[in-house]
UniProtKB/Swiss-Prot annotation:
<keyword id="KW-0732">Signal</keyword>
<protein>
    <recommendedName>
        <fullName>Uncharacterized protein HI_0366</fullName>
    </recommendedName>
</protein>
<dbReference type="InterPro" id="IPR019734">
    <property type="entry name" value="TPR_rpt"/>
</dbReference>
<dbReference type="InterPro" id="IPR013360">
    <property type="entry name" value="Pilus_4_PilW"/>
</dbReference>
<dbReference type="InterPro" id="IPR011990">
    <property type="entry name" value="TPR-like_helical_dom_sf"/>
</dbReference>
<feature type="signal peptide" description="Or 24">
    <location>
        <begin position="1"/>
        <end position="27"/>
    </location>
</feature>
<dbReference type="Pfam" id="PF13181">
    <property type="entry name" value="TPR_8"/>
</dbReference>
Length: 179
């Protein structure tokens, strides 16, 4: 499961950032500042510096506590720190703040799968795939394949692997060794 968790983590956060919708100049400035802090925090997490990551996430919250991206990044931070309840809470906040963000649904699904909550994960993956302006279907299909494999849901594994093969055959090939 460790290998699958690492693979899931590698797939979920390269595309956390999404475009902002048009808003007032003031709220956009707050959102821009919050996004900059989130980017710094994610950099610090990659450098294995959770203390500076958390400081920047807290500052991002001060800039815009109603920005889904801040809560999504906080969820990722808590997940990395093993604070499962906090991660779950932050994913729920992020989804409630903007339910149209496929990336958040995909990441939440990956988190739920890592917690062995397969059915809930599947729901989040479906929401991701059905989100408007979501362009990372291959990532989500890959996450579904990994999740189904870890849950021993071989019918879903095979069906989704075929979907992945149709849109990104090269990605699907790496699963040949899992059979």
């Amino acid at each position: 499961m460790k290998t699958i968790s690492k693979q899931l983590s590698a797939v979920i956060f390269p595309f956390i950032f999404s475009a902002c919708v048009s808003q007032s100049a003031s709220s956009l400035n707050h959102q821009t500042a919050a996004k900059a802090r989130v980017e710094l925090a994610l950099s610090y997490l990659q450098q294995n510096n959770p203390q500076l990551a958390k400081i920047n996430l807290d500052k991002a919250l001060q800039h815009d506590k109603n920005y889904y991206l801040v809560h999504s990044a906080l969820a990722h931070y808590y997940q990395q720190q093993g604070q499962i309840e906090n991660a779950f809470r932050e994913y729920e906040i992020a989804v409630n703040l903007n339910h149209k963000q496929g990336d958040v649904h995909n990441n939440f699904g990956t988190f739920l799968c890592s917690q062995k909550k397969f059915e809930q994960a599947q729901q989040q993956f479906e929401l991701a795939l059905n989100s408007p302006n979501y362009y990372h279907q291959a990532d989500t299909f890959e996450n579904i394949v990994l999740c189904a494999y870890s849950a021993q849901k071989m019918d879903i594994y095979q069906q989704t692997l075929e979907k992945l093969r149709q849109i990104d055959g090269k990605r699907a090939e790496k699963f040949n060794s899992l059979k």
